[in-house]
């Protein structure tokens, strides 16, 4: 099981702040997880439709979409950050 945490409009579109899920064995990266999540229903598809722009963190450390998620306890998703 891994805890998925959602922030900002990702959270608003899904309607959850977090959830614990058992990942399929073939989901090995952030990109794979985003693709899998997008298949879980209309709300998830809407939240992850801009998959390439969504940022992620594995166990509170920013991660690229190619990062392996094996052994992760928590994966967070949030929109791109801006600021000065």
Predicted regions and their residues:
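Ubiquitin-like/PB1-type beta-grasp interaction modules and other compact soluble beta-rich domains
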Residues: 1-83
């Amino acid at each position: 099981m891994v805890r998925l945490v959602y922030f900002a409009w990702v959270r608003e579109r899904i309607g959850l702040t977090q959830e614990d899920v058992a990942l399929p064995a073939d989901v090995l990266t952030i990109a794979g997880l985003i693709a899998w999540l997008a298949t879980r229903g209309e709300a998830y598809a809407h939240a992850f439709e801009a998959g390439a722009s969504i940022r992620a963190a594995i166990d509170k450390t920013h991660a690229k979409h190619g990062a392996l998620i094996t052994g992760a306890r928590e994966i967070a998703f949030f929109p791109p950050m801006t600021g000065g």
